[in-house]
Structures are given as C-alpha cells and as structure tokens.
C-alpha cells in the first residue's frame, strides 16, 4: 500500500487527453468514480519519494461483450470468471467496479560517492602512474 502516488486516466495512448486524475490515500487506494464505458490509459504521473514511476501506461477498458460488462486490462478480459490478486471486477448497487493493483518498486540505491575508498583507489592509481613514469625515465637514461 503506497500513499501519495498520483495517477492520471487518459483517453488516448499518447497520454495527452486527460480524463481524470487522483492521488492514492493513506491505504494506497484510489477511486476513479463513474468512469464512462470506453478505453483509457492509466499512467503514474508522480511517484512518492524513493519509488519509481511505472514506465508504461496500462491500457484499461470498460465495455460490454455479449451483453456482459467486462473490465479489460492490457487486452486481458477480467470478469467474474478470471479474477486474480491483481485484477478483479465486482458489482455494487448496479455499478460495475474494476479493481486493479499496481505494483510500485523502490528506486535503486545509488552508491556513495566521495567515500574514503574512492580516495584510496584514486591515490593508488596516481602512485602506480608515477612509478611507471619513473621507471620509463630511468630506462630512457640508461639507453643514452
């Protein structure tokens, strides 16, 4: 459950025609209320500190197939027969509700810079270069 993630539902694949946006609550839930039948693209527009945004939008459709309302996620039909832990569809008070879990991952931890180890490595590299130059200089004097 991730609070503070911002998602936008777009009407086109280019994610330029905004339908509705919202921010996840303290429990990590977000409700887009009374969305019309159609095809949308869900994009994470802002991730909380320390987390990465989703790379690609998620295609979401609300439509009727053979007289049944269905919820379609990335071209996979979700109905009462094939719900799983990430996607499901329920009916409450004649409203069809598509439920979806979006997994956010923490950003990669960056290595520490400027540490004592870095100074030691750079110092060792410089020392080796100086030793090599000194040897070359001595060899050149011996040939003359």
State where each predicted segment sits.
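Solvent-exposed loop/turn and edge beta-strand elements of beta-rich ligand-binding domains
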Residues: 1-144
């Amino acid at each position: 459950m991730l609070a503070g993630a911002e998602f936008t539902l777009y009407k086109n694949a280019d994610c330029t025609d905004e339908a509705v946006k919202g921010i996840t609550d303290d429990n990590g839930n977000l409700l887009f209320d009374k969305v019309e039948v159609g095809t949308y693209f869900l994009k994470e527009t802002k991730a909380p500190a320390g987390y990465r945004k989703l790379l690609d939008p998620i295609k979401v459709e609300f439509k009727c197939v053979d007289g049944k309302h269905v919820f379609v996620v990335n071209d996979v039909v979700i109905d009462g027969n094939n719900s799983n832990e990430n996607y499901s569809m329920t009916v409450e008070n004649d409203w069809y509700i598509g439920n979806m879990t979006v997994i956010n991952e923490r950003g990669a931890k960056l290595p520490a810079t400027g540490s004592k180890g870095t100074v030691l490595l750079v110092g060792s590299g410089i020392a080796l270069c100086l030793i090599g130059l000194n040897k070359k200089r001595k060899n050149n004097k011996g040939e003359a």
